[in-house]
């Protein structure tokens, strides 16, 4: 018996990193997983796993989200993972950077939740998990201005949805990781003027001496997706190795 037997889970950003690790972990626990991503080629890597279906999806496109919703009869868990990390202070953030980050990190979750929540309400049960960060209202982080602003908004969105629909059987939580060793992080490191120093800087701020793995975050995802967390809603779950202390 798996911890997620019979559950239908839809998630975004499933092609790599936390989204991919979570999709695999969900499937191993018996869930039917519909993993989406804008990168169709990378997404194909998940098709070899039992219990995982894939769909190409741009989470900033309302019409694509609505089309996906019509293809799915039931949804037990919605996991919003897609996000973008902008590097810089407010002075480095142009209006286009601000708009793009907010569109990907916040508006996409608004669109996904607003589209799939009615199905959950009709079922009188549902579970929403949003990806936030400790770089948010939890902790001020250098050169993460618009990113942190967007992730603070995700915490607010999470708590609002949880409060509004708790009596209708809906749970909503968010996950707030610290620095997670993912392909996205490695790409950002390589894009810095001195990648070797950038990596050292990331490691230096980790009180545990290492970065979190995507698989460790996926363990928390499984818990929140399962009935073990049936009494848990409206919370920002920190998994940062003590970085925010």
Curated annotation (Swiss-Prot):
Task: Respond yes or no to whether keyword Cytoplasm is given for this record.
Answer: yes
Q: Which gene encodes it?
A: bdh2
Cellular compartments per GO CC: cytoplasm
The organism sits in which domain of life? Eukaryota
**Active-site annotation:** 147
Q: Which InterPro entries match?
A: NAD(P)-bd_dom_sf (IPR036291), Sc_DH/Rdtase_CS (IPR020904), SDR_fam (IPR002347), SDR_superfamily_enzyme (IPR051122)
Q: What is known about what this protein does?
A: NAD(H)-dependent dehydrogenase/reductase with a preference for cyclic substrates. Catalyzes stereoselective conversion of 4-oxo-L-proline to cis-4-hydroxy-L-proline, likely a detoxification mechanism for ketoprolines. Mediates the formation of 2,5-dihydroxybenzoate (2,5-DHBA), a siderophore that chelates free cytoplasmic iron, thereby regulating iron transport and homeostasis while protecting cells against free radical-induced oxidative stress.
Pfam families (UniProt xref) = adh_short_C2
Binding of substrate, residues: 144, 188, 205
| Keywords carried by this UniProt record | Cytoplasm, Lipid metabolism, NAD, Oxidoreductase
Its name, as the record gives it, is: Dehydrogenase/reductase SDR family member 6
Assigned EC number: 1.1.1.-, 1.1.1.30, 1.1.1.104
Compartmental location: Cytoplasm
The annotated subunit structure for this chain is: Homotetramer.
Amino acids binding NAD(+): 16-18, 37, 58, 151, 180-184
Q: Which reaction does it catalyse?
A: cis-4-hydroxy-L-proline + NAD(+) = 4-oxo-L-proline + NADH + H(+); (R)-3-hydroxybutanoate + NAD(+) = acetoacetate + NADH + H(+)
In what pathway does it function?
A: Amino-acid metabolism; Siderophore biosynthesis
PROSITE patterns for this protein: ADH_SHORT
List the GO molecular function terms.
Answer: 3-hydroxybutyrate dehydrogenase activity; 4-oxoproline reductase activity; oxidoreductase activity, acting on the CH-CH group of donors, NAD or NADP as acceptor
What lineage, starting at the top, does this entry show?
Answer: Eukaryota, Metazoa, Chordata, Craniata, Vertebrata
Family, per entry:
Belongs to the short-chain dehydrogenases/reductases (SDR) family.
Can you cite a GO biological process for this protein? lipid metabolic process
The family database entries (PANTHER family) matched by this protein are listed as: DEHYDROGENASE_REDUCTASE SDR FAMILY MEMBER 6 (PTHR43477:SF4), DIHYDROANTICAPSIN 7-DEHYDROGENASE (PTHR43477)
């Amino acid at each position: 018996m798996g911890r997620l037997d019979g559950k239908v889970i839809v998630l975004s950003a499933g092609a790599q990193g936390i989204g991919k690790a979570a999709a695999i972990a969900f499937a191993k626990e018996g869930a039917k997983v519909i993993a989406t991503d804008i990168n169709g080629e990378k997404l194909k890597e998940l098709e070899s796993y039992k219990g995982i279906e894939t769909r190409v999806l741009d989470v900033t496109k309302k019409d694509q989200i609505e089309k996906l919703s019509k293809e799915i009869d039931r949804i037990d868990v919605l996991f919003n993972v897609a996000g973008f990390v902008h590097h810089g202070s407010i002075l480095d953030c142009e209006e286009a950077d601000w708009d793009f980050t907010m569109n990907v990190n916040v508006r996409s979750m608004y669109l996904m939740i607003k589209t799939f929540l009615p199905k959950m309400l009709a079922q009188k049960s549902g579970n929403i998990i949003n990806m936030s960060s400790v770089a948010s209202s939890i902790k001020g982080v250098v050169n993460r201005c618009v990113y942190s602003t967007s992730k603070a908004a995700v915490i607010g969105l999470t708590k609002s949805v949880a409060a509004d629909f708790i009596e209708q059987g809906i749970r909503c939580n968010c996950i707030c990781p610290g620095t997670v060793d993912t392909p996205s992080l490695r790409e950002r490191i390589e894009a810095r003027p001195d990648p070797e120093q950038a990596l050292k800087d990331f490691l230096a701020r980790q009180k545990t001496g290492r970065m979190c793995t995507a698989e460790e975050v996926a363990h928390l995802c499984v818990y929140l997706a399962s009935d073990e967390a049936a009494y848990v809603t409206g919370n920002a779950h920190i998994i940062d190795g003590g970085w925010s202390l």
